[in-house]
Amino acid sequence: MKRLVIYYIATSNYKMGLAHFKLNIHKFFPQFEKTVVILSDGLDEWNNVEENGVTYKVHHIHHFCWPIITLFKMTLIRDFWEECDYACYFNGNMQCNKDYDYNNSNYDFDKLNCAWHVNSSNVEFDGSNFANISNNSVAFINEPYKYIHGGYFFGPSDIVKEMCNDVSKMVEEDLKKNVIPQWHDESYLNKWCVLNKDKVNKQRFVSYQKYTTDQSIAIIETIEKDRRTTKRFFK
């Protein structure tokens, strides 16, 4: 049986998303042996738990303020890497929105599968738009492209691992210049996909999961608080 490792980063109030995420994840390619690797500042009670045939592992990480947690997303995945046939990532505020079957899906299992951003699925951007803060960033893209959502990706382990390593190097290169692109991991993911078009199958598979009003407000408040904190460190 092929092994799929799903990386799931959830700190602060994003930890609430796990209750929704775990409802359907067993329907996500049921032909695979699935392990969910949770990177969190909590959720320790889920370490070594098995539910609906899915194994959960928890690795404790510091609650870094926004945008650090997203900026180093690929680095975290690289650092907590587990050998597998396929690797996947879900944001803490997302979940699988339907059943997926290996023999009946529009996935390319030899490439990195990404998702169009929900607000830009039919729009082409270039390097001068909001996707990158300036051409000082390694993530700057100077050609038309469709903007990819950073909250999800899936692919064979060798390609996902290559992407995480490459993006980590991009982040390090920018930080040496005190540069952070506007959309952090998303900007670097888009740049990697532009540079590696032959390794990418871009389809729109997932959407943001709508939580209850209380949860949505709590998540938004956390993001805004982290934005204010971050401004003290990054001008």
Predicted regions and their residues:
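Short, solvent-exposed loop/turn segments at secondary-structure junctions
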Residues: 11-13, 42-45, 63-64, 94-96, ...
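Short loop/helix-cap segments at secondary-structure boundaries that form the rim of catalytic
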Residues: 44-54, 102-108, 211-213
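Short, hydrophobic beta-strand segments that form beta-sheet elements in well-ordered domains
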Residues: 34-41, 88, 113-114, 199-200
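Conserved glycosyltransferase catalytic-site signature
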Residues: 70, 74, 93-94, 182-187
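GT-A fold catalytic core of metal-dependent nucleotide-sugar glycosyltransferases
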Residues: 73-124
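Short acidic (Asp/Glu) patches
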Residues: 69-78, 129-142
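Catalytic core and acceptor-binding pocket of nucleotide-sugar-dependent glycosyltransferases
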Residues: 138-228
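N-terminal anchoring/stem segment of glycosyltransferases
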Residues: 1-72, 79-83, 224-226, 231-232
